[in-house]
A protein has these predicted regions:
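PLP-dependent amino-acid enzyme catalytic core
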Residues: 21, 25-349
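Short, Lys/Arg-enriched N-terminal segments with co-localized hydrophobic residues
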Residues: 11-24
Length: 349
């Protein structure tokens, strides 16, 4: 296959396609595939061009021809590096001097901490007390200052806004930001460049950054491709939102997909999703564990529960892919080995 790996010295450019201080709706209205292309230019030499893998077994199980875009092999183990790096690469001198702040359950936390380290700036990360130990440890090792909160009783967005005002740091949320969306879309851009047009694109859905960015790429590079988001059954706020035509808020969902434990889709994200996404479906936690086992046994890959969302929809028949060319975004592979073993044992229960 074309593509493979591209690793190089990071280059941070000061660009001004968006002003972080502009009103949100002004920014999202301007978001287009051109922003994904510009993000790809900034990421060149910094992000891995992750491999696209296939599996004869997966094709037999699903009846389709599946192409797995493996962002579990991205820097820090997830697609989140793309959006975080793209956002920080656009900081002006004042923003760089003050540093960056975010809130995240894990992967965006690591992505911001690593991108900030590469840029030579400070980072403060607000993480839930029950975040996976592996993700907390990696965030600290990348140089991020970690502040914890209770995800069930405290509001991370309020904490983030308060700290941003107190410290003067730029807040880059995990998904509701135009530069984050544009960066995430580069994963689908690479996929289409490698395999050509597709019939269906399945994308993991939490807050909507990856889905929105990939939808922008799909509409430009494969106009007839059906774009489908996949979220956990316990957290189907995205599905409800798309059907109602407005953002639906839910309680914090209880699911093993910790990267999708969000209460609502972001505004920037939904602005794109309602225009460019065809459907949103859900999968069960059991299906996620079974898909994790499939990746480990058949494709020799370690994939976290959230990273299995899109693949689970194809492998378990939630989306009919028979006779179709299907792109599948594997969003990440950051799972504690002890947690992985624990989840595998549930299959024998």
């Amino acid at each position: 296959m074309r593509g493979g790996w591209t690793v190089g010295v990071p280059r941070f450019a000061i660009l001004s396609a968006f002003d972080f201080r502009e009103p949100a709706m002004t920014q999202s209205a301007a978001l287009s595939y051109r922003d994904v292309e510009l993000a790809a230019e900034r990421l060149l030499g910094a992000a891995h061009r992750t491999p696209v893998l296939t599996s004869t077994t997966a094709n037999k199980l699903s009846g389709g021809t599946l192409f797995f875009k493996c962002e579990n092999y991205q820097r820090m183990g997830a697609f989140k590096f793309r959006g975080a790096y793209n956002a920080i690469a656009k900081f002006d001198d004042a923003q760089r001097a003050a540093g960056v702040l975010t809130f995240s359950s894990g992967n965006h936390a690591q992505a911001i901490a690593l991108s900030a380290k590469l840029a030579g700036i400070k980072s403060t990360i607000i993480m839930p007390q029950d975040a996976p130990a592996l993700k907390v440890k990696a965030t600290k090792e990348y140089g991020g200052e970690v502040i914890t909160y209770d995800r069930y009783t405290e509001n991370r967005e309020e904490i983030g806004r308060r700290l941003s005002e107190e410290r003067g740091m730029t807040l880059i949320p995990p998904y509701d930001h135009p530069d984050v969306i544009a960066g995430q879309g580069t994963a689908a851009k690479e996929l289409f460049e490698e395999v050509g047009e597709l019939d269906i694109l399945l994308v993991c859905l939490g807050g909507g950054g990856l889905l929105a960015g990939c939808a922008l790429a799909a509409r430009a590079l494969s106009p007839n491709c059906k774009v489908i988001g996949v979220e956990p059954e316990a957290g189907n706020d995205g599905q409800q939102s798309l059907r109602k035509g407005e953002i639906v808020h839910i309680a914090v969902p209880k699911t093993i997909a910790d990267g999708a434990m969000v209460t609502h889709i972001g505004e920037h994200n939904f602005d794109v999703i309602r225009r460019a996404v065809d459907d949103i479906v859900t999968v069960s936690d059991t299906q996620l564990v079974q898909t994790m086992a499939f990746f480990a046994e058949r494709m020799k890959m370690l994939v976290e529960p959230t990273g299995c969302l899109a693949a689970a929809a194809a492998l378990h028949g939630v989306v009919d892919v028979k006779g179709k060319r299907v792109g599948i975004l594997i969003s990440g592979g950051n799972v504690d080995l002890s947690r992985f073993a624990e989840l595998m044992q549930t299959l024998d229960a």
